[in-house]
From Swiss-Prot:
Gene3D superfamilies noted in UniProt: HybD-like
UniProt KW keywords: Aspartyl protease, Hydrolase, Protease
Protein's recorded name: Putative hydrogenase maturation protease MJ0631
Organism field: Methanocaldococcus jannaschii (strain ATCC 43067 / DSM 2661 / JAL-1 / JCM 10045 / NBRC 100440) (Methanococcus jannaschii)
CDD domains xref list: H2MP_MemB-H2evol
One term of GO molecular function: enzyme activator activity
The keyword Protease is assigned to this record: yes
Phylogenetic placement of the source organism: Archaea, Methanobacteriati, Methanobacteriota, Methanomada group, Methanococci
Protein's GO biological process: protein processing
Family from the record: Belongs to the peptidase A31 family.
This enzyme's EC code(s): 3.4.23.-
Group of enzyme by EC: hydrolase
Disulphide bridges: none
Amino acid sequence: MKEMLLDKLKNCKKLVIMGIGNELKGDDAVGIYVVKKLMRYFGEEKEFINIKNLYLINAGTVPDFFTDILKEIKPTHILIIDCALMDKDVGEVKIIKEDEIINYSFSTHTLPLSIIVKYLKKFINAEIIILGIQPKIIDFCPISEEVKLSGDKLVNTLIEIIEELKLAK
């Protein structure tokens, strides 16, 4: 996964990592879980933080709310992390191509991810990377241990990449 992400993030000058999901719906929270852990590592946990050329956004169920902020930031790359029903093993992380978005069911946000990505492509000249994480359960419960473990591994990989690309220091 690290090599694939590094390849997608080559020439990255300004990175936005956006976590999407609903913390009340089990594994649907994984995007938020990852971003919150990154926030704690790089600074503080809020809805939005900026460290040098790294922007971390906890978008919750309203990623469309942050489109104006993204237009102001003008990132070169946007990494969206979301729970996705992909018929994969629980916790599996997959880079989802833009033309594959319609094949998967994403978490409980207000607008479909396909519409958000089309909007971002139209108004922001950025490479958009979508990471889907296969859930175990999407119900009123805590995030499952399997998906949490997968999220922790992704956090460690992202920290390595961010430090390697010198985006936050």
